A protein has these predicted regions:
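Intrinsic low-complexity/disordered segments
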Residues: 2, 7-8, 24, 54
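Cysteine-centered motifs
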Residues: 32-34
Length: 234
């Protein structure tokens, strides 16, 4: 049944591409499995299994300054909980978790005078901030240029939703060694957990409905900084 569903889903996406006649942002394709794909023209047009609709921006949750304040607070909380930064290593979940980890790393370098080693994990296909498809994420690549054994590992992601991506990242870290602790830092926790996963550090708790989408925009990928609450209009 699952195989048949996947085949049907892929066929629908192929038809949508052809009917739309547009070039799509390949990097966003895996983030928008359920809600659809956005074209590069930036008009927010969405093509999905639920039909064709428009992503409507309901509210801006954080601007650039609010995000900086939240990440600075997370930086202080991480240092306080771990009694310094000497034993820390950071792992960003690509894509947006990676630059968030780098920003916190820069903050802690100012606070403690120590640069925390940073690595990254690439989780394939499904993202907790957008996907509602109940399939397990897969590890595409883990780039950890340090030994995790005995270290306090902090995982970073932009949005925490079902917890499936975080669980996959935890499993990836354990496949590389035996850390002392694994902690989770999240910019936005939108709720709706499907697994017993809880963030140790949260920039903002944001109650949402399942029809809504939390979009974190960073200049590295989006040309702007902010957190936005979106909804799919059919």
């Amino acid at each position: 049944m699952g195989r048949l569903y996947n085949a049907a889903r892929q066929q629908v996406f192929k038809l949508r591409y052809r009917d739309a006649g547009k070039i799509f942002d390949i990097e966003r394709r895996r983030r928008c499995v359920c809600f659809g794909m956005r074209d590069l023209a930036g008009n927010g047009r969405i093509f999905s299994l639920r039909g064709v609709g428009t992503m409507h921006q309901k509210a801006q949750i954080m601007d650039e300054n609010a995000m900086k304040r939240a990440l600075m607070r997370l930086s202080h909380e991480i240092v306080e909980k771990n009694k310094g930064a000497a034993n820390l290593v950071f792992v960003g979940i690509r894509r947006r978790g990676e630059p968030i980890a780098e920003r916190v790393c820069e903050n802690i370098a100012v606070i403690e005078g120590i640069r925390v080693p940073c690595g990254s994990i690439d989780i394939k296909f499904y993202r907790d901030d957008l996907s509602t498809v109940a399939e397990s994420p897969e590890i595409r690549k883990a780039s950890l240029p340090f030994d995790v054994n005995g270290r306090d590992v902090v995982l970073f992601d932009d949005v925490l939703y079902t917890g499936r991506t975080a669980r996959a990242a935890i499993e990836a870290v354990f496949s590389c060694g035996r850390p002392k602790t694994i902690q989770l830092a999240i910019l936005v926790d939108r709720g709706h957990r499907e697994l017993p996963i809880r963030a140790d550090y949260v920039g903002k708790n944001l109650p949402t409905s399942r029809s809504e989408l939390v979009e974190v925009r960073l200049p590295e990928f989006d040309g702007e900084t902010g957190v936005f609450l979106m909804d799919l209009e059919s």
